[in-house]
Amino acid sequence: MTAVRVYRDDGPLSRALGRTAGGRLPPLPFTVLAAAATGVLLAVGPQPGTRIGPEPAVFAPLVVLLLAGPASDHPHTGRLDWLVPPILRGIEYGYLAVLGDARAVPVPLVYVLLTVLALHHYDAAYRTRQGRRPPRWVRLAGLGWEGRMLFTAFAGLLAPLPFAYAALAAYLGVLSGGESAATWARHGRAGGVMVDLTKKLSEGVGDGPHGEREKRA
């Protein structure tokens, strides 16, 4: 799997559609079309101050999935295919922000969810560049961009949307934060040297200004 495909952060549903299409569909045109469709659906709904209901905005995640999902198995080796992941991030973040604003989700809660997502994606990108991609089970458990959008859209049909935002933020925070912390605790930084600071401080030993060892008073 190429790095660009990892950056897409596809979930089980998108991956299933990609396998069905067999990697034959070019990803960029369909992703751009998905972004345009999301913009149109958000422009005509949801209506501010109302609960999510059978209006165009609730179907935006499904439309994006059907447009961008089948291209998920493509190798993404085209000259401009690197644009696909940031477009998907814009679709997901924009949808959650607009939906949260229209459904009276507290602004701090919207920011918390978006921050957790940003950290989740940053961690995946950084680890991929260091040659330590997140495990497959973590990527699947993270639901993918399509799973998170579908969850927030349809969870609002059963309960107030703030609960869905809070639940998703907590779930992703525990999943991504816990697994990432455990991974770095085991391996340390790629290419670096792990230092036991507790041991060094207890010994009171450090490096002098010229590289020699010196004893702290």
Where on the chain are the PLM-derived regions?
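Helix-to-loop junctions at the C-terminal end of transmembrane segments
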Residues: S72-G78
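Hydrophobic alpha-helical transmembrane segments
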Residues: M1-P70, W82, P86-T128, R133-A217
